[in-house]
Regions:
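A generic fold-level signal
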Residues: 11, 60-61
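N-terminal [4Fe-4S]-dependent radical SAM core
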Residues: 1-6, 56-60
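Local cysteine-cluster metal-coordination motifs and their immediate loop/turn environment
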Residues: 10-23
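Conserved non-cysteine loop/helix-boundary elements of the Radical SAM core domain that shape
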Residues: 24-54, 61-144
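Alpha/beta-hydrolase
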Residues: 7-9, 129
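Residue-level signal for beta-strand positions within conserved beta-sheet cores that form or flank
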Residues: 1, 17-19, 96-98
Length: 144
């Protein structure tokens, strides 16, 4: 049996009209709210889960898949995503052939961002392009 981890990043630049996922935009979060501490909180939660597993004698194999989904994980800094991945590695270990993916919005990444992810161990990016047809994008409230 494989051990796989999903890390939810519930932030988006804007809400898409069709989306039913648990997501938040800056407007939803309100004045003064910040995504800045999110990675640290996820890392703390990993430690809590690992402590619980240890207490209950649960020893998972190395992680075979790590998937960052959302929302739009790439609304966080690349260094935050890498820090969370590093915490997975330190907490459970990651298999040598693991698939490590983040969902991304083309509006939130550039070549430097992608390079930082690759250097940090990510080996797959899923760009959620819904359409290239302008009127379809307008209907979906999407930019891509």
């Amino acid at each position: 049996m494989t051990f796989e981890i999903y890390i939810h990043v519930p932030f988006c630049l804007r809400r898409c009209g069709y989306c039913d996922f648990n997501t938040y935009t800056a407007v939803d979060m309100g004045a003064g709210a910040s995504r800045g501490n999110y990675a640290n909180m996820v890392i703390r939660e990993m430690a809590i889960v690992r402590d619980w597993q240890t207490t209950h004698g649960i020893n998972e194999p190395k992680v075979a898949t790590v998937f960052f989904g959302g929302g739009t994980p790439t609304t966080l800094k690349a260094s935050d995503l890498v820090a969370m991945l590093d915490a997975v590695r330190a907490t459970w270990g990651i298999a040598d052939d693991a698939e490590i993916t983040t969902e991304a919005n083309p509006d939130t990444v550039n070549a430097d961002y992608v390079k930082e992810l690759a250097d940090g161990g990510f080996n797959r990016i899923s760009f959620g392009m819904q359409s290239a047809v302008p009127h379809v994008l307008a209907t979906l409230d999407r930019t891509h």
